[in-house]
């Protein structure tokens, strides 16, 4: 049997880029909670002892940006210079302006357009992907890398591994078989974890704890064998981390946010953007379309693309590829998709309830992936029933 290796990586919530994603989405949540029509494009950057939020926001909400930044950093665990950032004493810079009136008139007519008339906030193309290899209908390599990152944070916060610090990265290589276009995972080939730690712990203790408390609970036993390779903190030392170790920026982890290198990506990031930004809303609706195709048995694996022009409500194109796994021809699947999903940005916002912020709704998406999550706030993960004639 022919097999191949495929690798996906993830980072946990203390990684500087992910810290920035979470701050940007915390700002979005705060804006939408008070004013669902907020127009938000919020970027964040960070380096030693400094966080800056900047961008374009038009909102009726009263926002304390500095408090949001400090609260988000503190919740993640950045509570001292030792761990990479001190939430209560770092510099917080804010440079927020209003949305360009040129963009506002073209997209939503300064809030006068009806939902079905709202144009895309920018041009671009987005992809949605689904595969039947996991219950989440997501790629296994991505699911495992993501869950390892989440578990690292869990055992840090609950005290199981008190030597852990917030920053960390994971990577999983899976051996696959291509079954007529569908992906069948056979085993985990390599597990890599690099996690920030304090000065007190030895490399042997790190490796033992990671195997026992992180890898064992996350990776099903059936995928591990005596040949599985483990690289656990292979650099030998990772004490300096967070923004002290590396600069961070919103939108730098778009593959981790989506499908771990599977499918395709149009390049647009998600965090800090309201639903008129099709980078986000367009990607969410095509995930729902792809997932619904697989869940309804139309195909075992599927990718959907949508594209937009700024100010134009209707998509320019919709594309479907079932990688040869479709039960009916792709052109018929495409017809079903177009009949069942409304790709106009104003309607996506209504149908997926994307103008509802607050309670960490979008903040939750900003670490551990936007897709394949079992949470009612992730409305784009709800499978739509699709009617089709079985051949």
UniProtKB/Swiss-Prot annotation:
> Where is this gene product found?
Cytoplasm
Q: Which cofactor does it need?
A: Mn(2+); Mg(2+); Co(2+); K(+)
Residues bound to Mg(2+) are 9
Q: Indicate which residues the UniProt annotation says bind L-methionine.
A: 56, 99, 246, 277
One protein family per Pfam: S-AdoMet_synt_N
Cite the EC number: 2.5.1.6
Q: Which reaction does it catalyse?
A: L-methionine + ATP + H2O = S-adenosyl-L-methionine + phosphate + diphosphate
Q: Is the keyword Ubl conjugation assigned to this protein?
A: no
Q: Which Gene3D superfamilies match?
A: 3.30.300.10
Which pathway does this polypeptide act in? Amino-acid biosynthesis; S-adenosyl-L-methionine biosynthesis; S-adenosyl-L-methionine from L-methionine: step 1/1
- Cellular-component GO terms for this entry: cytoplasm
- Cofactor note (record): Binds 2 divalent ions per subunit. The metal ions interact primarily with the substrate. Can utilize magnesium, manganese or cobalt (in vitro).
Q: Which processes are annotated in GO (biological process)?
A: one-carbon metabolic process; S-adenosylmethionine biosynthetic process
Q: How does it assemble?
A: Homotetramer.
Q: Kindly give the HAMAP family that the UniProt entry links to this protein.
A: S_AdoMet_synth1
Protein name (record):
S-adenosylmethionine synthase 5
- What organism does the UniProt record list as the source? Vitis vinifera
This protein's gene is called METK5
